[in-house]
Each structure stands twice: as structure tokens, then as C-alpha cells.
Amino acid sequence: MTEVQRPPLTADERGQLIGWLDLQRSFVRMKCEGISEEDAHRKVLETSPLMTLAGVAAHLRWNEWSWFQKNLIGVPDTGQSPWTEGGHPDAEMFVDDVPIAQLLDEYDAECARSNEAIAGLPLDATEQGPYAAAGEAASLRYILCHMIEETARHVGHMDIIRELLDHKTGYTKMSLA
């Protein structure tokens, strides 16, 4: 079972931001616990056929990479991302042939890389990637707030998808440590 730990009740700004992001990240794995491979890839939202548990997990993995690796610390995209010039804007969600366990492991690994990338950076550090060159560099603080919102919003999607699949809702009991 995924360990879900509430963010610290009294922490500095950095601790709060990372704590809330890590909480939302843990919900991604939790929403997929016990799901069959078939259901992880099952399309239940007629108007959003890419919105499967597997598709959302893949989307969040690549958002982690894009915001923290590419944008913040300036790692160039040398073809490792699913996005190509002229390709589908949601290419990262085409994962029908990728096992959910692999997608979740890749997501966890990307989240760990994100945390490593930001470990020594002040919240006012700004992007070194493509947006910086265009004069639109966001701060680490902005990126953390955005990723909390992005991840939480998609966890809500996952909650709805899971409920439609097998009627499971909500969260498990959180550790108060």
C-alpha cells in the first residue's frame, strides 16, 4: 500500500511546497493500486479517450521532466520526450502498450530526479531552459505551485476514472508523522 504522508503542519515555505507536491504525487500511485492492466488502460470518458489511469500517469511523468529538467535546469530535449515537431500535443498519453507498473515506476523515478534537481536551489531560482531564452523564466516557487496544481487536478481526474471503473473513491488514512 502506498504510504501517504501529510505535509508538515509547521514548516518553512520550501518545506510546505515540497510537502504538498509530494503528497499529491503519492496519490497518483495510490489511485492505481490494485487496478488491473486492462482497467488501467480502459477509456471511460467518452469525450477524453486519452484520459485513462495509465495516460494520466504518463502525462504527469512527462510534466515533471518538462518543468524541472528541461525548463528549470535546462536539460535539452534530445529526443527523449514523446513530443516531436508537428506531432500530437498529447503524445505522452499514447501508452496503451505500456504496463501501468512501468509507468508508475517511471513517474516515481522522475519525481525523485525532480527533487534532486531542486534540492540546492533557492525558491527564487529561475528557469535555465527555453523560456529563459525568451525572457519568460519562472521561479522555482512558481514551478512548485504550478506542479501542485497540475498534479492535484489530475489526481482528481484519476479519482473520477477509478470511481467509474470500480467504484473506489477517496484516500487512505494518512500518516500524521
What is the meaning of each model-derived region?
Residues 88-131, 139-150:
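Acidic/histidine-rich alpha-helical segments that form the ligand environment
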Residues 12-17, 99-101:
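Active-site rim elements
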